[in-house]
Curated annotation (Swiss-Prot):
Cell location: Cytoplasm
Catalytic activity: 7-aminomethyl-7-carbaguanine + 2 NADP(+) = 7-cyano-7-deazaguanine + 2 NADPH + 3 H(+)
EC code: 1.7.1.13
Function recorded in the entry: Catalyzes the NADPH-dependent reduction of 7-cyano-7-deazaguanine (preQ0) to 7-aminomethyl-7-deazaguanine (preQ1).
HAMAP family: QueF_type1
Keywords noted in UniProt: Cytoplasm, NADP, Oxidoreductase, Queuosine biosynthesis
Native source species: Rhodopseudomonas palustris (strain BisB18)
Primary localization: cytoplasm
Name the record gives this protein: NADPH-dependent 7-cyano-7-deazaguanine reductase
Length: 158
């Protein structure tokens, strides 16, 4: 079981529990990690970002996606406030759907070194074409239950 929560003053490196400025770019954003108290157990963590936003690198128009991030943690967990700030930093970032989705997955994997990670980027149509992007690291640890991401393929009105 977890120990007594620390006060922010005891965790000076974390953004959690303190006022921080919104990062303006993904490169500027800091992803915090915290020790996994269940590191000896294989299990799954899921983050859902149904209102992810970035900018088209050509037109500057907003692009919208439903992101699903699943990972089997190792020694580290992603701290969720820092993930929220990192994802929000894409609001003023111009990149194609594929680049955004894969870059997010790679950055998280680099920071926390999970046993396994996958990201699904379900992008809303631009120019009449929805784009879904999927990326993962290696193989899922044996015995870890991974539910379907459950985001339906875009059908429009037809």
């Amino acid at each position: 079981m977890s120990k007594t929560p620390r006060k922010p003053s005891q965790s000076p490196a974390l953004q959690l529990g303190r006022a921080v400025d919104w990062p303006q770019t993904p490169d500027e954003a800091k992803l915090d990690r915290v020790p996994n108290p269940q590191a000896d157990t294989d299990y799954l963590v899921r983050f859902t970002a149904p209102e992810f936003t970035s900018l088209c690198p050509v037109t500057g128009q907003p692009d919208f996606a439903h992101l699903m991030i699943d990972y089997a943690p190792g020694a580290w967990l992603v701290e969720s406030k820092s993930l929220k700030l990192y994802l929000a930093s894409f609001r003023s970032h111009g990149a194609f759907h594929e680049d955004c989705t894969v870059a997010i997955g790679k950055r998280i994997a680099q920071e926390i070194k999970p046993k396994w990670l996958r990201i699904g980027g379900y992008w809303y149509p631009r120019g009449g074409i929805p784009i879904d992007v999927f990326w993962q690291t290696g193989k899922l640890p044996k015995g870890v239950w991974v539910p379907e991401q459950g985001v339906a393929t875009y059908r429009g009105r037809g």
